[in-house]
């Protein structure tokens, strides 16, 4: 296990999460403006699809947060174990 590679993966996951949050904010703004003037069955179907997409996106963000936390914990565990092992042999 290379702690540097693990730390890099955790950083990339966090960056992806921030990027997704920016995209979601932009999408929500566009959808809100769209539905000011759009009505009818198509608008209702779109609103339902948007709610479904938003629920899936929220699940993805939650899973990403859990994965990031697990990666951070694993990094701390590995680097701690490495430091202990090095200390025993120094």
Swiss-Prot record:
Subcellular location: Secreted
Pfam annotation, one family: WXG100
Chief location bin: secreted
UniProt entry tagged with the keyword Repressor: no
Induction context: Transcriptionally regulated by the sigma factor SigM.
Keyword Secreted assigned: yes
Secretion signal, residue range per the UniProt entry: none
Any Gene Ontology CC annotation: extracellular region
Name of the protein: ESAT-6-like protein EsxE
Organism whose genome encodes this protein: Mycobacterium tuberculosis (strain CDC 1551 / Oshkosh)
Gene: esxE
